[in-house]
Regions:
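Residues at beta-strand starts and edge strands
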Residues: 17, 30, 94-98, 112-114, ...
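Residue-level signal for short segments within beta-strands and strand-turn junctions
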Residues: 25, 38, 104, 122, ...
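Surface-exposed loop/turn and secondary-structure junction residues enriched for glycine/proline
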Residues: 32, 74, 224-227
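Electropositive, glycine-dotted interaction segments
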Residues: 121-249
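Conserved P-loop NTP-binding catalytic core
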Residues: 66-140
Length: 249
């Protein structure tokens, strides 16, 4: 992570808080929305951490939310989501949708709002993938005939910043013809060279196969950094990645 953050950037890192979370067709939650009080008004920079509690009756979705946070942490930290979460898609649904809104407050008083959303489904493992997954299992372990992994797709990153009048989509991976859209933002963040375009396509496929985030995987962020590590969009991405790796849990 230090390779992605310059010394100048390190001097103005924000306090990051989750402001809102939306879960759709995730486990027993058809639609769930949580708004955190800490995001409703300005909290002075570098103040003590907020203490929030979630309460509700059995089956109200508390555990589902914690599991959604765990998935979020894995994705934003650039790690693979465990296959244990493959069963989180609601019964009878093809995929789940999760959305998280973040409040970023900086030392200089600037406040930005970032949104990261994605879809989650499950995919049956091939025989080779099953053998690879359980290659270190004890001899007496019974390897299952079938198993599943998590598939992450349709990632979307948008941002409201000090010079923007409204939320703007920065990265949308739902396109089949391009690694991500809008094209203007892709060229600004990653450059327009053919080699970069091929590398982005490879990363997108790798992320899909390995249950990772295309946006937050190190391979993608390094491409962005090589193009320009001082763009606002790149810096917010690495700030969110730092938050996930060190402060989310």
């Amino acid at each position: 992570m230090n390779k992605l953050i310059t010394s100048e950037h390190a001097e103005n890192l924000p306090t990051v808080r989750i402001k809102k979370a939306i879960l759709k067709d995730f486990k027993n939650v058809g639609y769930g929305e949580i708004i955190f009080n800490c995001g409703r008004q300005f909290v002075p920079y570098n103040t003590e951490a907020d203490i929030l509690g979630i309460y509700g009756q059995n089956g109200s979705g508390k555990t589902s939310f914690i599991e959604a946070l765990s998935i979020l942490q894995d994705l934003m930290a650039g790690a693979a989501v465990s296959g244990a979460y493959a069963d989180c898609v609601a019964i009878g649904k093809k995929f789940s949708e999760l959305e998280f809104i973040f409040d970023l407050q900086y030392k200089n008083g600037i406040i930005r709002e970032a949104t990261y959303s994605f879809c989650l489904s499950r995919k049956k493992l091939s025989e080779d993938e099953i053998h690879e997954k359980y290659k270190d299992a004890p001899d007496d372990f019974e390897i299952p005939d079938e198993d599943y992994k998590v598939v992450v797709f349709n990632e979307r990153f948008s941002l409201i910043w000090e010079n923007a009048s409204k939320r703007q989509v920065i990265i949308d991976t739902s396109s089949k013809e391009s690694p991500f859209i809008p094209t203007t933002k892709r060229k600004e963040i990653a450059g327009s060279g053919k080699k970069t375009l091929v590398s982005l396509e490879v990363n997108k496929q790798l992320a899909y196969e390995k249950s990772r985030s295309f946006i937050f995987m190190m391979e993608t962020l390094q491409l962005f950094a090589e193009n320009d590590n001082k763009t606002l969009f790149f810096q917010v991405l690495v700030e969110l990645r730092l938050f996930a790796r060190n402060y989310l849990f």
